[in-house]
Amino acid sequence: MYKRQVEQIEDVAKYDTVKEVDVVANFGHIRAGKYEEVTADIKACADAAHKYGRELKVIFETDALTEEQVRKACHCAMDAGADFVKTSTGFLTGFDAHGATPEIIKVMQEEVGDKCKVKGSGCIRTREHFLQLIDMGIDRMGVGYRSVPVVLDLDR
């Protein structure tokens, strides 16, 4: 179980200024097919966040997973009571970085439907990509500060 993560969530979630908490799912367990453990870990984190009225975002590091693993991880998060599923932290090493591709966002949206929100994060660096994700109905995006002027077309 994510005992330390639960303790950290409890430490920060009690502050009124905290509205959401991010947690990284154990992608090693996801890759190994240990979905019951993944669900239990996320549920413990969701329970801790919800105890204080905070939303929980679960990050999968989709660049380290197959499409099928992402689909199953989405179900783990939904079953555990997560509020968001999120593509990546932006700090994963050892894998090619693709981040919030339209393809992986579509997969996540297909799996969670209206039961969970989707946040795309990582590699959103062009206005076209940004607008495409908006057109797809993504709930939220994380855009690196260097990319903000580009995606918002502020460099005119």
Regions found by a protein language model. Name each.
Residues 31-34, 61-70, 145:
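Active-site glycine- and acidic-residue-rich loops that bind
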Residues 35-57, 62-64, 75, 79-80, ...:
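Alpha-helix-loop-beta-strand connector modules within alpha/beta enzyme cores
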Residues 1-2:
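Conserved small/polar residues in nucleotide/adenosyl-binding loops
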Residues 5-16, 42-47:
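Short, charged beta->alpha transition segments
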Residues 36, 69-72, 100, 131-132, ...:
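Short amphipathic alpha-helical patches
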Residues 5, 14-30, 79-97, 123-125, ...:
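Glycine-rich phosphate-binding active-site loops on the catalytic face of alpha/beta enzymes
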Residues 9, 42, 70, 74, ...:
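Generic hydrophobic/aromatic pocket-lining and core-packing "Φ" positions
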